């Protein structure tokens, strides 16, 4: 077995197993040595060619706002806008300034220890309404997992994103091309998602999944955890809006491609400052 390691602001590394308990650093030829703020990885054969392809979740190697980046802010058409090198990282929503993350990276395995970076805007990735992406999402990514969510034997992809950036769910069409799941399939999102895992928790033959966040189990502590980001109004008739809440979310599959969010009903909405989760049979029942 070989070894992939992500790094924050340093090249992600590939170590090839020499077969004698030693490893050779093959990063220079692997094609994955970017310097983003990588937080985790997921592997699956998305194009059915017999080798594992690679998804790298990126957050941000540095914070533009906290590390003192110089911003060029102008007012255009009565709206505040950031220009220059940080235009993609810093955006105004209303009069509030928000810092976005770095784009995730999706690599196809060439089968010889090297990887080819996929372009987000090459029509391989489509929005939920079928339009090709024109630029990558810049989310604050923390975790990703491949799972066949719709039973077509092709690995789909779920990404848990921190902060206000929405979680992403990509459905594989079987050829390694992806389309965002309909917002009507997943109606509720966690606000600062940290980790995700899948399992069939009710034995109905369909995978369910759990996303962890940071809500305290103590009522007193919850009162000190209120965020400062103001709420946003939802226009009448906007039925595709997915509200984000500061708590865990448990998604139970209905069997028709949609999910019921049951964290409060199931008693798992709060688990303190949680970073990851995993399903396993602890009591052997």
Please name every model-derived segment.
Residues 1-285:
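Acidic, glycine/proline-rich Ca2+-coordinating loop motifs
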């Amino acid at each position: 077995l070989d070894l992939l390691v992500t790094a924050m602001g340093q090249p992600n590394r590939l170590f090839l197993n020499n077969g004698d308990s030693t490893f050779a650093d093959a990063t220079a030829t692997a094609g994955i040595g970017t310097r983003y703020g990588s937080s985790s990885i997921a592997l699956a054969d998305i194009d059915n060619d017999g080798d594992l392809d690679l998804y790298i979740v990126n957050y941000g190697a540095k914070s533009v706002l906290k590390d003192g980046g110089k911003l060029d802010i102008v007012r255009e058409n009565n709206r505040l806008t950031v220009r220059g090198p940080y235009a993609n990282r810093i955006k105004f929503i209303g009069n509030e300034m928000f810092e976005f993350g770095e784009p995730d990276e999706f690599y196809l395995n060439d089968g010889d220890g090297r990887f080819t970076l996929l372009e987000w805007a090459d029509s391989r990735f489509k929005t939920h309404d079928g339009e090709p992406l024109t630029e990558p999402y810049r989310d604050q990514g923390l975790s990703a997992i491949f799972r066949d969510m719709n039973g077509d034997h092709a690995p789909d992809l779920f990404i848990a994103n921190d902060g206000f950036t929405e979680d992403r769910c990509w459905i594989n069409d079987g050829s390694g091309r992806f389309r965002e799941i309909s917002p009507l399939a997943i109606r509720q999102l966690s606000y600062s998602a940290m980790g995700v895992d899948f399992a069939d928790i009710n034995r109905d033959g369909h995978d369910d999944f759990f996303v962890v966040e940071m809500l305290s189990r103590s009522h007193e502590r919850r009162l000190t955890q209120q965020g400062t980001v103001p709420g946003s109004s939802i226009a009448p008739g906007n039925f595709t809006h997915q509200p984000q809440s500061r708590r865990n979310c448990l998604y139970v599959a209905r069997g028709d491609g949609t999910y019921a969010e049951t964290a409060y009903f199931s008693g798992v909405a709060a688990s303190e400052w949680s970073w990851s989760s995993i399903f396993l049979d602890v009591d052997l029942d």
